[in-house]
UniProtKB/Swiss-Prot annotation:
The keyword Aminoacyl-tRNA synthetase does not apply. Keywords: ATP-binding, GTP-binding, Nucleotide-binding. Displays ATPase and GTPase activities. This is Nucleotide-binding protein ABC3036. GO terms for molecular function: ATP binding; GTP binding. NCBIfam families: PRK05416.1. The keyword ATP-binding applies. GTP binds at residues 64-67. ATP binds at residues 13-20. Belongs to the RapZ-like family.
Length: 296
């Protein structure tokens, strides 16, 4: 980040998806944090920031749902700021999401009432909120699915994505998963590798994962795997620079096999190793331990 540049992260998303954890994480990263700033005040706040108030260079703003007009004002403010030629601001939206069933579970556990729920039925409020937030989710530069994340894991993910913003301008996140458990909702691109030879049918490899050499060597040795890797590398080499040029701060690439244990893990690790010298590349393996957990 340039010394004169001011980074502003707008934190929003579904109620119960982890915004409170997120803002505490940004505070620990040294961001100047404000909770529930009305969008109508955003331009005035930015004016103070650009005037050099307290020499603030990193800001995180939490903006919750207050109705459609609330976000109309937010979009208008962001568009006006982005159209200012001399602006030294870097504004991005971080959207926190989770599956409806997980949000319902969290509301039941905390015994809180959803702000849009009538009669205390959280699912009704969640569905209304999801519809209202559809546009802002579409404009978000970063989306984090917190369905399977504990608070500490969400904190670690935010730290991983934002701690290095002063040194890295573009991150590539390769996430392996199993199609039987659903597609990651925060993935920008999804690739299906279920056509590759499956180590699950090799008795010695079945209990192992793609993090182990025996499995990765098996997956990568096949002609079809080598051809696929070559073609996908060509695609990534073409697409990633364009994503970066368009101002996207991160691309999440989902690679899925049946259970998320062997093939997808192998290829996520392969591509991460291939691109880590060029980009801020990292991996996560969403479903790598689910088969073991389900067999207990």
């Amino acid at each position: 980040m340039n010394q004169s540049e001011v980074e502003i992260v707008i934190i929003t998303g579904m109620s119960g998806a982890g915004k409170s954890v997120a803002v505490r994480s940004f505070e620990d990263l040294g961001y100047y944090c404000i909770d529930n700033l009305p969008p109508v005040l955003l331009p005035k706040f930015i004016e103070l920031i650009e005037g050099g108030i307290d020499k603030v260079t990193k800001v995180a703003l939490v903006m919750d749902l207050r109705g459609q007009s609330f976000f109309d004002e937010l979009f208008k403010a962001i568009d006006e700021l982005n159209e200012t030629p001399a602006s030294r601001l870097k504004i991005q939206i971080l959207y926190l999401d989770a599956k409806d069933s997980k949000l319902v579970q969290r509301y039941k556990e905390t015994r809180r009432t959803h702000p849009l729920a009538k009669g205390g039925l959280p699912l009704e409020g969640i569905q209304k909120e999801r519809n209202l937030l559809e546009e802002i989710k579409g404009r978000a530069q970063q989306i984090i699915d917190t369905t399977e994340l504990k608070p500490l894991q969400l904190r670690e993910k935010i730290m991983q994505r934002f701690a290095g913003n002063d040194r890295q301008a573009f991150a590539v996140h390769f996430v392996s998963f199993g199609f039987k458990y659903g597609i990651p909702i925060d993935a920008d691109l999804v690739f299906d590798v279920r056509f590759l030879p499956n180590p699950h049918y090799v008795e010695d490899l079945r209990p192992k994962t793609g993090l182990q050499t025996e499995v990765s060597s098996y997956v990568l040795k096949w002609k079809e795997t080598k051809q696929f890797v070559e073609k996908l590398t060509d695609l990534f080499d073409f697409m990633l620079p364009h994503y970066k040029r368009e101002g996207k701060s991160q691309v999440v690439i989902g690679i899925g096999c049946t259970g998320g244990q062997h093939r997808s893990v192998t290829l996520a690790e392969y591509f991460c190793a291939h691109y880590e010298a060029k980009y801020d590349a990292y991996t996560s393996h969403r479903d790598i331990n689910k088969r073991k957990a389900n067999s207990r």
